[in-house]
UniProtKB/Swiss-Prot annotation:
Organism (species): Yarrowia lipolytica (strain CLIB 122 / E 150) (Yeast)
Pfam families listed in its UniProt record: EF-hand_5 (PF13202), EF-hand_7 (PF13499)
Descriptive protein name: Calcineurin subunit B
InterPro entries (UniProt xref): EF-hand-dom_pair (IPR011992), EF_Hand_1_Ca_BS (IPR018247), EF_hand_dom (IPR002048)
One Gene Ontology term of the molecular function aspect: calcium-dependent protein serine/threonine phosphatase regulator activity
């Protein structure tokens, strides 16, 4: 039991969760892991409440999947959820939001990446040409150093003054 507790404490290092919260998340993870493989495949991850209906569900899965394995292990699960906890700070939440847009994980949001993610959100409600105009205007406004892409610092300057990060808080317990 003590060994199990220390494993949970170790898993929780660097997160915003107490060991009791980690234990509750482990139990939730095990319920989601319907095939008891120790990892969440895409279909299991999408069974998280509110995720399947989210137009960015595939991007959320990719951001949680820190090692690019195509699935989410328990450590990745709690690391990702930590951002959404009530104890997650503004910068963590903005960093997560940035990663949703940074598809190739190069530390920048390109014109193409912004288009893809916005297309996921608006679907066919806008013509591609209209969406491209929005993307171009957004890049122009946010890109302060003129390199044609948005760095995290530029992203933070653009959206940090909004309350978007507040919508990234979930009551997990």
């Amino acid at each position: 039991m003590a060994d199990e507790r220390s494993k949970l404490e170790q898993a929780g290092e660097g997160t915003n969760f107490s060991s009791d919260e980690i234990d509750r998340l482990r139990k939730r993870f095990m319920k989601l892991d319907t095939d008891a493989s120790g990892i969440l495949e895409t279909n299991e991850f999408l069974s998280l409440p509110g995720v399947a209906a989210n137009p960015l569900a595939s991007r959320l899965m990719d951001v949680f999947d820190e090692n690019h394995s195509g699935d989410v292990d328990f450590q990745e699960f709690i690391n990702g959820l930590s951002t959404f906890s009530t104890k997650g700070n503004k910068k963590e939440k903005l960093r997560f939001a940035f990663k949703v847009y940074d598809i190739d994980r190069d530390g920048y949001i390109s014109n193409g990446e912004l288009f893809i993610v916005l297309k996921m959100m608006v679907g066919n409600n806008l013509k591609d040409a209209q969406l491209q105009q929005i993307v171009d205007k957004t890049i122009m406004e946010a890109d302060k150093d003129g390199d044609g892409k948005i760095s995290f610092e530029e992203f933070e300057a653009q959206v940090g003054g909004t309350n978007v990060y507040q919508s990234m808080t979930l009551d997990l317990f």
